[in-house]
A protein has these predicted regions:
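Outer-membrane beta-barrel signature, preferentially recognizing the C-terminal barrel domain
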Residues: 259-263, 310, 360-368, 406, ...
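Extracytoplasmic beta-strand/coil segments of soluble accessory domains associated
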Residues: 25-29, 36-37, 52-89, 113
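Surface-exposed extracellular loop regions of Gram-negative outer-membrane beta-barrel proteins
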Residues: 290, 341-344, 348-349, 395, ...
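Gram-negative outer-membrane beta-barrel transporters
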Residues: 488-491, 509-596
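N-terminal periplasmic accessory domains that precede
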Residues: 51-54, 93-97, 122-143, 157
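Short acidic/polar hinge/loop motifs at secondary-structure boundaries
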Residues: 85-112, 217
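C-terminal beta-signal and adjacent terminal beta-strands/loops
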Residues: 615-670
Length: 670
């Protein structure tokens, strides 16, 4: 099954229609066929304000900032700026591009399958944003308001400054940030017994509020024989949440949540040439985080409070040496050393009495080292091969309420093949072993009071491993049209899900081996043949089938939090002679299942629609307005009276009409 994807994808090449002419693509200059060049004129009709406005409009590309994991290698996204990723993990590619004025972009390269001097970091497709180096100074001011039906009204905005002077750049940003919550609003909750008889009905009201600040500064320029990049940032947030259930003649049930997280980071990146074909890149990253979390529940017969005080930190040192042996062959090798820690103090009080939780007080530390090597070979202009191996060793030590020390070693090979079948037709194949990183929060206790659930900590967590076989077929047409079909199969070891503990508790843990099979289709269709010269329709569909053995019942089921089906429809139309762009997005349906020993929960969304328009005045002021209607949210819960037999104690159905909201934004660059 692991390699079936490869053969199925190869069969597609015999049934796909011929590609359109190469001259319909963006200006290619002297670029290889696997690198598409997009110059500023390609985006002119949309009047972009930032580099991010340009990148999100590239046909056949979906922005990813990478995974939120420890270390740098597994967290890399698919955005590069001048051939490199940002100096700090916390400063994502989209964040950098959002504060980079569009006028500074010289060109954007869409790299499919690899290119000399480009660190793909396991990505099949990346964009490389090339910035102009001439003297410039720009300031950007943004004012925004997000107004929810029935409240709250959340103001936000930002001020950014950037300067470039013959290779030296610096900038700063101050931003007001606000949270969002897709489940707030009014609705109804109905609880039934196993026979379907109604136990009680309640009205449901969910409110939230909050806000925070984020600041960041950056500098880059020549130092010694190389180039140094420095970035640092800090942000803090306040978030409050209130969920109320009420019914005439019955006591209310109230659940509140308050979280005050903050983060600080500093990143340094230094790159220098050691010769005409040899290049060295080094990185140092330091990050800290603090969380103060309180959750309360109050109702008939219960008064509970769960508190968490958490401090975490990460230190990373990384070096990469690249040797361009020839135009066809590039070697790369290096290493990464990371230290992570997390201190957690938690308490749970129920009806005035402290409740002992497994691993409520704990400190987790990890020392992780990785060495890696990779070779990229272009057999011809149409065939490219990438082969690599990463060797990871880590030691995780836990102290506090319980102690443990464990060592892990995992080899992570990767093989990727890119084949240009025709000028506009490409096949990408990948076989790779990926190692998931453990969430330090899973080592400590946690709670979900509205779902009547307490999770104990787990000393014995192991990283989840995947053997991934993937094939992507890409067909480009009509200048900016593109269709991609993805077939993927994962063989998963040590699946991480929820396991039963003694005393009626549960915890995050490993539940054995599993599989995931994915079929995804994406289409970007230009609408010029329908009379909309700058119109386009984008369709994205993904089907996932996951299977694993339930640790409680022994039955086969899906893996928690894997959506079986997702789809989206987006329409955009640029009207350059009126300095206007408008469009809409539609999400028809999504479903998130969660399986635990004591209950099964599903979150289902239906018919989410966003309509937007943006007008750019002659003086450069851009005015944006959008209306979002979240039509239907369903929260269903089956609670069992017995774990082993999973006899239904009651079923809970929550039907919510989430609050619609309007966003208004003014942005001026000068």
């Amino acid at each position: 099954m692991k390699h079936l994807v490869f053969f199925a994808a190869l069969a597609l090449t015999s049934v796909t229609p011929a590609a359109s002419a190469q001259e319909n693509l963006p200006n290619q200059a002297e670029a290889p066929e696997n690198i598409l060049i997009f110059e500023p004129g390609f985006f002119a009709a949309a009047v972009p304000s930032s580099a991010l406005d340009m990148v999100i409009r590239i046909p056949g590309f979906s922005v990813s900032d990478g995974a939120s994991v420890r270390g740098f290698a597994g967290a890399a996204g698919n955005i590069l700026i001048n051939g490199a990723r940002p100096a700090s993990k916390a400063d994502s590619g989209t964040s950098v591009l959002s504060r980079t004025p569009a006028s500074r972009v010289e060109r954007i390269e869409l790299i499919r399958g690899g290119a000399p001097g480009i660190d793909m970091q396991g990505q099949s497709v990346v964009v490389n944003v090339i910035l102009r180096s001439e003297i410039s100074r720009q300031q950007t001011v943004t004012a925004q308001a997000t107004i929810f039906e029935g409240g709250p009204a959340l103001p936000s905005g930002s001020y950014g400054f950037s300067s470039s002077n013959n290779g030296t750049q610096w900038g700063l940003e101050l931003r007001r940030i606000v949270p969002t919550n897709t489940s707030t609003g009014v609705g109804k909750s109905t609880r039934r017994d196993a026979s379907g008889a109604i136990i009680f009905k309640e009205q449901r009201r969910h409110d939230f509020d909050g806000g925070g600040w984020r600041t960041r500064g950056n500098w880059s320029g020549p130092v010694g024989l190389g180039r140094l990049e420095i970035t640092g940032g800090y942000w803090l947030m306040r978030y409050e949440d209130e969920l109320l259930f009420s019914a005439p003649g019955s006591p209310e049930r109230l659940f509140t949540l308050k979280n005050e997280p903050s983060r600080a980071d500093l990143g340094l990146r230094y790159e220098r040439a050691l010769g005409r074909t040899l290049n060295l890149e080094t990185r140092l990253i330091q990050a800290y985080g603090w969380d103060d979390f309180t959750s309360r529940s109050l109702g008939p017969g219960f008064n509970q409070q769960f508190e968490t005080d958490r401090t975490a930190g990460e230190s990373i040192a990384r070096a990469v040496l690249r040797w361009e042996r020839s135009e066809a062959l590039t070697w790369e090798g290096g290493g990464e050393l990371a230290y992570n820690f997390m201190d957690t103090e938690q308490s749970f009080i129920s009806n005035g009495m402290p409740v002992v939780l497994p691993l409520a007080s704990t400190r987790v530390e990890e020392v992780r080292g990785e060495v890696f090597g990779q070779a990229s070979w272009s057999q011809s202009e149409r065939l490219r091969l990438e082969a690599g191996l990463r060797l990871e060793h880590s030691t995780i030590q836990q102290s506090g309420d319980a102690s443990s020390k464990r060592n892990f070693f995992y080899p992570k090979p990767r093989l990727a093949l890119t084949f240009d079948l025709h000028e506009n037709r490409q096949m990408r194949l990948r076989l790779e072993r990926e190692l998931g990183q453990l969430n330090f929060g899973d080592f400590a206790a946690s709670s979900s009071l509205p779902n009547d659930q307490l999770l104990g900590g787990n000393l014995n967590l192991r990283p989840q491993q995947r053997w991934i076989s993937e094939a992507v077929f890409e067909q480009r047409f009509d200048r900016d049209g593109v269709m991609t079909l993805t077939l993927r199969h994962d063989e998963i070891s040590d699946v991480i899900d929820v396991i039963p503990l003694d005393g009626g508790l549960t915890a995050i843990g490993n539940i054995g081996d599993g599989t995931l099979t994915r079929i995804a289709a994406n289409l970007r269709l230009p609408l010029r043949n329908l009379g909309l010269e700058q119109g386009r329709l984008t369709l994205n569909t993904q089907y996932d089938r996951s299977r694993v053995t339930d640790p409680t019942t022994g039955d086969r089921r899906a893996i928690s939090r894997v959506r079986p089906f997702t789809t989206s429809i987006n329409f955009e139309h640029d009207v350059p002679n009126r300095n206007l762009r408008w469009g809409l997005s539609y999400l028809p349906w999504s479903r998130d299942p969660t399986f635990t020993p004591d209950q099964q929960r599903t979150v289902e969304r239906r018919h989410d629609v966003t309509l937007f328009a943006e007008y750019t005045f002659e003086n450069g002021l851009a005015a944006y307005i959008s209306f979002t209607k979240w039509d239907d949210l369903r929260l269903d819960r089956d609670v069992y009276s017995d774990r082993m037999t999973q006899v239904i104690a009651f079923r809970e159905e929550q039907r919510i009409d989430p609050r619609d909201f309007v966003q208004i934004r003014l942005r001026r660059t000068f």
